[in-house]
Amino acid sequence: MEKTKEKAERILLEPYRYLLQLPGKQVRSKLSQAFNHWLKVPEDKLQIIIEVTEMLHNASLLIDDIEDSSKLRRGFPVAHSIYGVPSVINSANYVYFLGLEKVLTLDHPDAVKLFTRQLLELHQGQGLDIYWRDTYTCPTEEEYKAMVLQKTGGLFGLAVGLMQLFSDYKEDLKPLLDTLGLFFQIRDDYANLHSKEYSENKSFCEDLTEGKFSFPTIHAIWSRPESTQVQNILRQRTENIDIKKYCVQYLEDVGSFAYTRHTLRELEAKAYKQIEACGGNPSLVALVKHLSKMFTEENK
């Protein structure tokens, strides 16, 4: 018979394991491997750091889906629609602390400090994002970018920060991490409202249903202050496909997608420059190139 402790662990982790079996892009692992071109962290430490980052990322997705009232994740039902909200919250929080336990095995005096700081950043960013959405407050582009750096940058910063503790490479990688954090999130925002891959994979334009202020919608709202169409559509939390299609067309008409593509191209170019300044990194360049295909190819 299954031991009681093992059985309890299995039950606790089931929602988390459900999420793990969904197909993912493993971008964070690839990113850590790419940064190791410079940092040359011993393999045993690197594996622990990658595991910790993946654990925190996936646990935060479980919570995100609850906070966003999402229906689908990677084209599958969200964990809380199967296991219920209380179990999923508990499972995700449990995994945060399993991550902390793993960080302790790195056996470095600064590791826990770094872990704590980056998780605080992550929650501060997420809190702002939710506040704007739920109070119908449209942030400026600058406010939005600052929030993204806390939210997306939090986990990027954790992986690379932990790696640097075990590396002789002491260049300041924060500017590059910030560029990549913005690039990833704005690309994600664009994909959610514009890409075929996303509309088949996520419920169509889920960011509109969630009422989320994302990079293209923020541009549309601030560039056409005389119109409140986008705010009103976001406020409705609509699942109506026709309204969502109308909104996407409106974003196209007011130049928000073109502006988003332009911003992504600028961030991409900036990333290449920063990578070069740090001494070059073929695998990181390849990763950025691969992610850029989405917003370059579909507009040829």
From Swiss-Prot:
Changing Y259C: Results in prenatal animals lethality. Pfam families: polyprenyl_synt (PF00348). PROSITE patterns: POLYPRENYL_SYNTHASE_1, POLYPRENYL_SYNTHASE_2. SUPFAM superfamilies: Terpenoid synthases. CDD domains: Trans_IPPS_HT (cd00685). Its cofactor is Mg(2+). It is found in: Cytoplasm; Cytoplasm, Perinuclear region; Cytoplasm, Myofibril, Sarcomere, Z line. Disulfide bonds: none annotated. One of its GO terms (cellular component) is cytosol. Belongs to the FPP/GGPP synthase family. Homohexamer; trimer of homodimers. This is Geranylgeranyl pyrophosphate synthase. It comes from Mus musculus.
